[in-house]
Each structure stands twice: as C-alpha cells, then as structure tokens.
C-alpha cells in the first residue's frame, strides 16, 4: 500500500528521485490487462498521497520561512511575503498560484483533518479536496471542521461522493450551519458579475452579449485558504 511504500522511514530527495526513475519502467513490460488497470489505480492513489505530503511539507516550509523572517527583523506586515511564490516555483507553477497552494495546504492540515486523511490514503483526488476547501472557506473554523467531519461520516466516507456530489453536500451542510455566510458569499459573487458586449461575427451583423466575472469570485479565490477566524454564528 501507498502508506507502507518506504516502511515508515525518513524519505529523502534521493529516495523520491530513485522512485521516479522506477516509474519510468511501467508500461514497458508484458503485464496483462488486470495488472495494467491495477497499476493505473495505484498510481492515482500515489498522486493523492503525494498531494497530501506536499500539503504537509508546504505548511512546514512556510513556518520555517516565517520564523526566519522574524529572526531577521522583517516587519510584521511583510512576514510570509514570497513564501507562496517559492512553493509555486517548486511545483513548476505560476507565482500567482502560490497563495492558493499555500492556502489549501493550511486548510487541509489545520481545519480539514478528515479530508486530508482521505487524500493521504489515496481515497480522493487533490481536486476533490480542493472542492471541499473551497465550499467551506466562508465558514468559521468550528463550522468548517464540522462539515469535514459530517462528510467523512457518510456511508463510504468522502470517497463515496463524486466531485459534484461532494461540492453540493459540503455546500448544503455549510448552509445549514451558517446560512448567513453562504448567502453573503453568493451575494458578493453576484455583485462581481458584469454584462459585457462584444462585436458579433460578421454574418450576424450585430453585437453579442454575455455575462462575465470582472475577476474570479472572491470566495472561490479564497476557497483554498483557511477559514476566517471569527466566532461561529448560530444557524
């Protein structure tokens, strides 16, 4: 199983590099159809376990960087600056996405323990974990953890729900726990929409209208970040 791959010993970068090299041999042998499909499944589980490990490492890296910045006398308002960009660079991603990677990692490790556990075991994908984080981002920490626990308590756990279903269920529970936060999010998202006009194709001799967001929905942008530190409201 994924969790026993390195026999609980400390895994080094050299170990990971060697394992990556081993993966290059997959698909070159004479495996039968059953073995091939099993390998595909195991690799999917490995991707999820790797995403969970990245989350844990990201949070630890961020903590060490903030500590070093404080020790260096960096002004309080600047603490943490540049951390997300370094994470994005390590992931070969745009620096602009660094804050999202960092936010998701902090949410999973601090506020969504059941979701993180499912990811570690390869039961859900990183995208499904992101959906849960996104749909609960407007809640208090207490309510966010409650949604996480309730999703995990479903028959079959979080893994039994597809992407759409898990997002809808998380949204439903969130609304039950704090309808004000959910309606505020919807209202804010609606206010950030705008109507645009663009020239239609020549054969239509007119203009075409459409609805577009001025910018990504704020709550969706924040969807991977830790919940706001505010007292939980009564439902």
Per-region residue spans from a language model:
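Conserved C-terminal region and hinge/linker of Rieske [2Fe-2S] proteins, especially
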Residues: 1-235
